[in-house]
Amino acid sequence: MAELKFAQSLAVVIGINQYGNGIAPLRTAVADAEAVAATLAEHHGYEVLLLTDAQGQLGPLRSLIQERLPALVQAGGRLLLYFAGHGIAQDGDDGPAGYLIPQDAMPGEVSSYLPMVDLHDALTALPCRHFLAIFDCCFAGAFRWSSTRDIDFAPDVLHQERFDRFCLDPAWQVITSAAYDQKAMDVLSLRDDRGEIDSGPGQRPAEQHSPFAAALMQGLAGGADISPPAADGKPAGDGVITATELYLYLRDRVEVLTQAQRKRQTPEICSLRNHDKGEYVFLTPGHELNLPPAPELNRENNPYRGLESFDADHSDLFFGRDKEIEQLLARLDSPHPLTVVLGVSGTGKSSLVKAGLLPRLADRRPDFWVLPVMRPGNRPIKALAQICAELVPESEAKRLVRQLAKDEGALVDIVGRWHQANPDRKLLLVIDQTEELITQATSPREALQFQQLVKRVMAEHWSFLWIVATLRLDFEAQFQDEALHGEWMDARFVIPPMSQAQLRDAIEKPAAARVLYFEPHSLVDKLVEDVAQTPGALPLLSFALSELYLRYLERRSDNRALTEDDYRALGGVVGSLTQRATQEYEELVDEDDAYAHTVKRVMLRMVALEGGALARRRVPLSELVYDTPTENARVQTVLDRLIDARLVVRGQDGVAAGEAGGAAL
């Protein structure tokens, strides 16, 4: 059986039933405390200090937190505090002021209560590495106003390296049985108004417990260890119960049980100011550890996309846009067949659709047939024909370009025949970077014809066809008065800037998926601050994070930490791109002065001036063929270097500067 390596495992368990001075007694608090104490001692190896009823008077409680615990608690150890009793909350200057009610408290005399802020300050002064408080009392959630920040939720899979980090780094967490404005139930009735709830294996059948305490003991017995699920004859779980997993288990059970009694009670979790990258953990009784190693870290396993957009293959690394994904998904049930996803350059329009909407649609809506994502390019009719080829027999596919160019009704007919063969399916066409109808289409007439084809097929087949297009906001005016103007206002879906919480998810969660950490954790705050006020900065952020990851690989460290020192050396979010572009340019010119002219040639091809602003332009490789073999060799070297540096993106039919990369280059 595995063991946790802590200098000490100490639990202080308090339960008060018999209050004096006219305060209503409780029925289960002492039984809850005794059962929790037994569980911790017998199944989790804790040394337990159990205090009940008169031992929970104000004097002994203050002595406990101010004198006994500082003398008992060891550095490098772990401490668990459990309290079952009365609690109240009153309005304070900075939110609800919470109090634990000692056994000898006087009703209405605040001086006879134990302020949660005093408890917080005394506890956070202790030298232990891990601390977990569990409060089962009314208004217990008021304790969060004494804490500093919400907890960070751990990924579904716990790797060995993350478990080691959880144990070694400070973990200071609090789980409460009720929110700051909720009462906690003493006994939950399942049969009548004073029934009992079974406390689980190993407990006396007639014993009664609060819903929270009963769920807590079931969770600590192994109920909260449910990930990964059971498979191949192996039980569910990995042998570890984290505080976060325990909280989720408690929330799911207590909320349902208490809501059934019309007395909703919502457990909460938060962290204290001492908390860092640790997590309070328990080992599951009778379960061997089953922790996979963290994924290998190499250039191919980079969790950040740099200047490239996310595709469906990268959906497991795409975070921060859940709300917008759900909104887009809902539009596919609306009567409006066209959705135009609008945003300034660098807001992640393409990624939202390709890595957000499409994977979620595939998971939830098997009735949708999704065509491959298309981009108009310089021949939009040809691009549309290539995408629609999968809707027709192979013998017809070769004639599609000519059909669509000659006959506006051809697309209507093709989609109609597909629907006859698939009457229960819906069809989705995604047009990415629709501004290419202006920036790249070689014929304005063909660009307009493309819009007319789209408009007509929507009008004819609106009951089963949906179209989602992405478009840079600065090109919107050039489409509003064209063929689609009648549908435009209903079609608009403007991506809002990311909130700080969304940015935090986009920064931290891809790193968590690779079991990477930010050192110090405040580096995440710095990254958020650097991009929060910069419209369209997501590609710059992603590039900086990608470079930060590559710096980690170059250091050959084994701590899996992305560091603030490396971030400063990169020049921050904005400076990292310019620094990398300058580095590649200077290295090329050092090899041969002729590269200065070649780089200029290549990069000027990748931008276009539209409406007084620079726009990225995808360049067919045929445009980068020059008169001499020597120059062509230099062009190929430039492209290889810029692509390898993730400054330029190679597609099937050409190359383009990464979003936000063209100007820097």
Regions found by a protein language model. Give the residues of each.
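Amphipathic helix/helix-loop-helix segment enriched in hydrophobic residues with interspersed Lys/Arg
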Residues: 154, 162-165, 200, 225-232, ...
